[in-house]
Amino acid sequence: MKLKAFHKLSYGLYLIASENKGRKVGYIANTVFQVTSDPAQLAISCHKNNKTTQVILDSGIFSVSVLKKEVNMKIIGDFGFMSSSDLDKFNGINTITAKTGAPIVLDSSVAWFDCKVVSSVDLGSHYLIIGAVLDSDEISDEEPLTYQHYREKYKMLSPKNSPTYIDKSILDAETSIIPKKELKEEQDHAPIFDGKSWVCVICGYTYDPEEGDPTVGILPGTRFEDVPQDYRCPVCNAAKEYFQEV
């Protein structure tokens, strides 16, 4: 079975949030989909080890914020790769309170849904949670973020708790057996640059010397070896020492 085939399935990227007894929690998800129109219901897939999952089950409420294509990567880093036990993810985040009482994240979002849990299914490592949509709103007409764009632009890996997680070593092995003709076609279209790429071992973000990191003043063409020692991953804030050459 070739696992890269799963990358052909289409997903968006969403921020799931909930609250119980004054405790706000949230995480980044790519498995949110509408299951019925009347009544309007959404389904989300939540890993059992996520703190947010238990809060959703206990409170019976959750919100879904649809992230925009040009998302603030700090939101991805905090909500996607940090634990709610270790960090107040909502500090400095623009939110409103939904009818259900769930927090709704407005930053980097194009739409939101307020949901009440109506059922859940134990899938082993995950729960499939069905929520009735009690309210929704469109924030802007900007293009929503897709998982394909996220993966290709930021060269990111899915977190281990994601339903779509695939071990990088398996993907690398599958890539190594691509027919030579296909590899040559990819190489023919690839930009010519002799710099080395470096991957954050925490979140999978790839530093590409050809692009640099203009957000912190690192110009295109800057080798990772020449990046300042206090450089940190723009996604998960990991130190430079957590990057490995690929």
Can you name each region flagged by the protein language model?
Residues 225, 238-241:
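Cys/His-rich finger/ribbon microdomains and the adjacent scaffold used
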Residues 194-196, 229-230:
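Short metal-coordination and nucleic-acid-contact micro-motifs, chiefly zinc-binding Cys/His arrays
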Residues 204-209, 227:
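Cys/His-rich short segments
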Residues 209-210, 241-245:
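Short, non-ligating residues that shape and space the ligands of small metal-coordination modules
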Residues 1-191:
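Basic, polyanion-binding surface patches
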Residues 200-203, 233-236:
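Short cysteine-rich clusters marking metal-coordination/redox-active sites
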Residues 215-230:
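Short linker/helix segments within small regulatory modules
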Residues 16-18, 196-201:
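A short beta-strand micro-motif
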